[in-house]
Amino acid sequence: MELHILEHRVRVLSLARPGLWLYTHPLIKLLFLPRRSRCKFFSLTETPEDYTLMVDEEGFKELPPSEFLQVAEATWLVLNVSSPSGAAVQAAGVTKIARSVIAPLAEHHVSVLMLSTYQTDFILVREQDLSVVIHTLAREFDIYREVGGEPVPVARDDSSNGFPRAQHGPSPTVHPIQSPQNRFCVLTLDPETLPAIATTLIDVLFYSHSPPREAASGGPGSSSIAFFAFSLIEGYISIVMDAETQKKFPSDLLLTSSSGELWRMVRIGGQPLGFDECGIVAQIAGPLAAADISAYYISTFNFDHALVPEDGIGSVIEVLQRRQDGLGS
């Protein structure tokens, strides 16, 4: 398999809900006029707490500082795994890279963020951790770094000088999980037809807000939550929304898989997770991979979110609760 280090240098930001009005103009520019901003990596995720933005340096320039905008200190690099065209199709999403990427990075104390889209899965690592990432994954992958749009092979360094060996160390923190009742769709859209849904998208993102709801907090079967994710990355659009919100959009423009599968969410974290802890994604992706369950995974500024097939949510909760009980004992 190949691991590509993409050219994007990404910043991760939290926009407080009361400050949304201040950023509507730059967000509309990033959403609908990417040629004007030259932004190639843009992701906006609405959660009950805030809006998480993942943007490259060009996109970051569009967002003026304010009391409403919180910026994570690190600059993040974007990794992407490509499988050979003839590879057997197994569970999709983060599950297929759980053993080969997520687990080894957790063992080497590398914190990761995940952004699954309709098209692929992006793994974000801090720029300062890149040498450890390359050293950790070089045995498993042919690694390429994009330079000027072209993949350049990264020399494999067989020496282990200066690199810590994988450690099991203290047990990871056991983070609570909840499963809101929403049923979600993972969709894409031909960028040429984006103007046709622009007014609906603006309405949903900026004007369709009920009063802020508490995050799902009633145990594994919590009520519905606000969640909407839009990404425009290298010209490809991906949208995650609940089935009720989808009804507002023209059905002939939004594309989904032929099965039209619906997904349920597992939300990870009782308190904001921060960016320093390692192994959070592995804590979820590992058990799902062992059970061969497909999952999309979206990290946000405060919490993580896994989307699993609707008909398997019961077994997913059981698998994860069993894992948590094992870690907590």
UniProtKB/Swiss-Prot annotation:
Modifications after synthesis and translation: Phosphorylation at Ser-14 by AKT1, promoting the interaction between CASTOR1 and RNF167.
Main subcellular location: cytoplasm
Modified residues (Phosphoserine): 14
Domain of life of the organism encoding this protein: Eukaryota
Subunit annotation: Forms homodimers and heterodimers with CASTOR2. Interacts with the GATOR2 complex which is composed of MIOS, SEC13, SEH1L, WDR24 and WDR59; the interaction is negatively regulated by arginine. Interacts with TM4SF5; the interaction is positively regulated by leucine and is negatively regulated by arginine.
Family the UniProt entry places it in: Belongs to the GATS family.
Protein name: Cytosolic arginine sensor for mTORC1 subunit 1
Source lineage: Eukaryota, Metazoa, Chordata, Craniata, Vertebrata
